Regions:
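Polyanionic, low-complexity intrinsically disordered segments
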Residues: 29-42, 47, 155-250
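Flexible secondary-structure boundary motifs
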Residues: 87, 91-188
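Charged, amphipathic alpha-helical oligomerization/scaffolding segments
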Residues: 48, 77, 81, 138-149, ...
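Charged alpha-helical initiation segments
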Residues: 1-72, 238-249
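Surface-exposed polar/charged interaction patches
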Residues: 52-55, 59-62, 92, 96, ...
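A structural signal for well-ordered alpha-helices, especially hydrophobic packing surfaces
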Residues: 53-56, 60, 85-86, 147-154, ...
Length: 250
């Protein structure tokens, strides 16, 4: 899946250079040209997520804490890109009388609800509804739930994290489900989300969890695109950032 893979974006190519005004005959600086583009927040944020994803992987051998910090930033950006994708799609593709149902920032809906409603707002596709009990939707719900648990932390008992040390005074690592003592009362679902294995403890997030997150997001984009008969990504609509050069008037 290449829904968010980088697309070269430069203003120094020949198409741009050929339109720039040369220096005037007096040898002075040319008049300034105005460059106008339409930003795709999905594309922008997804590329940022990929960069932090890569940096987290590179940092892992040097410092797990630094790697985890980068991983948390990457996950937040992956989720933000998902939100940008569906809100932009609602505006670009949706019926004008329904767009505000899911794309009004003054009345935000839970992200998973927006994914559910988008096919109906667009008003076309092979089916008006999505089976959210089938993969990748339960996994996508867990990715979103993890982000929500960071922004809506809940009471202390919902914020507990568990670690394991081989001996007193030794360094400690996040406790994995199979490492929990049988008589500890620690349930596996208190440590990780059951379908994705993503850790509930933000400090336990590692690069391989980002691999899972990206795979889930890309799978959700593919599934939604199929439901919309390809309208979501047709002609790279979701990533396209067209550029116009407005040359100065002589």
């Amino acid at each position: 899946m290449t829904s968010g893979d980088p697309v070269p974006r430069t203003l120094s190519g020949s198409a741009v250079e050929n339109r720039l005004t040369p220096r005037d005959s007096q040898g002075g600086q040319p008049p300034v040209s105005i460059i106008v583009t339409e930003v795709s927040p999905f594309h922008c944020l997804y590329q940022d997520a990929l960069e932090f994803h890569s940096q987290s992987r590179l940092m892992l051998a040097k410092s797990e804490s630094s790697s985890s910090r980068l991983a948390r930033a990457s996950l937040l950006l992956y989720v933000a890109s998902a939100e940008a994708l569906i809100h932009q799609a609602a505006i670009d593709l949706g019926r004008s009388d329904l767009v505000e149902l899911i794309a009004d920032p003054a009345r935000p809906l839970p992200t998973i609800e927006v994914w559910k409603l988008l096919p109906a707002v667009v008003g076309h596709g092979s089916s008006p509804t999505i089976d959210f009990s089938a993969s990748p939707w339960p996994q996508m719900a867990e990715v979103l739930a993890l982000r929500t648990s960071w922004t809506y932390p809940g009471p202390p008992e919902e914020r507990r994290a568990y670690y394991r040390a081989s001996r007193t005074g030794a360094s400690f690592d996040p406790l994995l489900p199979h490492q929990a003592p049988k008589n500890s009362g620690i349930r596996p679902e208190a440590l990780v989300y059951p379908r994705t294995g993503l850790p509930r403890d933000p400090y336990a997030l590692r690069p391989h969890h980002l691999d899972t997150t990206r795979g889930v997001l890309d799978g959700a984009i593919e599934a939604l695109d199929r439901k919309l008969d390809g309208a979501l990504t047709r002609d790279n609509r979701h990533r396209r950032e067209p550029i116009q050069i407005h040359s100065p008037t002589p």
